[in-house]
A protein has these predicted regions:
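The feature captures the beta-strand-to-loop junction immediately N-terminal to the Walker
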Residues: 34-36, 297-299
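ABC ATPase NBD Q-loop/coupling interface
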Residues: 63-78
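Conserved ABC ATPase "signature" region
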Residues: 115-133
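Conserved ABC ATPase signature
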Residues: 137-141, 145
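Hydrophobic anchor residue at the start of the ABC signature
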Residues: 151
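ABC ATPase C-loop
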Residues: 154-155
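Catalytic Walker B motif of ABC-type/P-loop ATPase nucleotide-binding domains
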Residues: 162-165
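H-loop/switch region of ABC-family ATPase nucleotide-binding domains
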Residues: 197-198
Length: 314
């Protein structure tokens, strides 16, 4: 289903990012690319989905085949009929302003009948219980909500291959569980999945193998059953995060002295975006003392990024 042997160097780089990297992924398998940032995961996906060399310039050698077809002579559109892609930053793949139109965009470009397009769009939002995101301005959505729209867009294309580049980078826990259900559904349908990830816990029961990359090479290919048995020390050597959230512990930190001065004070902050009826922020108040670390947590769209932009003066 996916077969490749690739080396690649970006046009402005002296050293290759991928060093004659090879792999074969049979139909219906889910492979997870792991490794530290900069090891070549995203570059490999770009080589497979055609963005390299058609968008990112550089020197590429080797081959890539999807469903037995060599992608070397294909346009990005032709590759898109075989494989759907989800990128780290959903804004980089949006072509419309309306969320429903975005999910329909790929189907329209492949010439499907309007009735079929509308059916697929409605089904995508309904199956994954995301009706609240229909007909929304994508630039008024949170980063996590935009990522969900990009995932629905890929799902609606109904290709045999799905390529996902760190799809949970902007997702909260609940949205990550939604993505897990989407991937489960695709796996049951016999789709082939290749994704790069740092978070691994949600892929239990979905991933068949974990391929660990380092310096543009695949250092090891580990079946899911073997990876689950890794000790914390083994995972640390391989730069793998935990596969089980129950293993995570949070050490207690010493309390700050009461005399430590405040360095940030937020008092009764409210904010409403233009064209929105409801407030994004309402009555937010807190203070931060010197050397104190505060984590803002909450569901996608609750206002975390908006609050950060207000504090930064953006």
């Amino acid at each position: 289903m996916i077969d490749f042997e690739i080396a690649f160097r970006y046009a402005d780089e002296k050293s290759p990012v991928l060093r004659q990297i090879a792999g074969n992924i049979p139909k219906g398998r889910c492979i997870v690319l792991c490794g530290n940032s900069g090891c070549g995961k995203s570059t490999l996906l770009r080589c497979i989905n055609g963005l390299i060399p058609q968008f990112y310039e550089g020197e590429r050698t080797g081959f890539c085949q999807l469903n037995g077809q060599d992608t070397a002579g294909m346009s990005i559109g032709e590759i898109g009929e075989l494989a759907s892609s989800v990128f780290q930053d959903p804004r980089s793949q949006f072509f419309t302003v309306n969320s429903s139109n975005e999910v329909a965009f790929g189907l329209e470009n492949h010439g499907l009948p309007q009735e079929k397009i509308q059916q697929s769009v409605d089904e995508a939002f309904r199956i994954f219980h995301l009706e609240r995101l229909k007909d929304r301005n994508v630039y008024e959505l949170s980063s996590g909500e935009r990522q969900l729209i990009s995932i629905l867009s890929a799902w609606a294309m109904d290709t045999e291959i799905f390529l996902l580049d760190e799809p949970t980078a902007n997702l909260d826990f609940a949205a990550t569980q939604q993505l897990k259900r989407i991937l489960f559904a695709l796996k049951r349908q016999g789709k082939t999945l290749l994704l790069s990830e740092h978070r691994l816990y949600y892929l239990a029961g979905i991933a068949d193998e974990y391929w660990v990359m380092e310096n543009g090479e695949i250092q090891g290919k580990y079946p899911a059953e073997e990876a689950r048995k890794f000790s914390p020390e083994q995972r640390q050597v391989l730069s793998l995060r935990t596969l089980d959230l129950a293993e995570i512990s949070v050490p207690e930190k010493p309390q700050l002295l009461k005399a430590v001065p405040e360095v940030l004070c937020v008092s009764d902050v409210c904010y409403t975006y233009k064209r929105k009826l409801n407030s994004t922020l309402s009555g937010i108040s807190f203070s931060v003392r010197m050397h104190e670390i505060i984590g803002l947590v909450g569901a996608n769209g609750c206002g975390k990024t908006t609050l950060g932009k207000l504090i930064a003066g953006l």
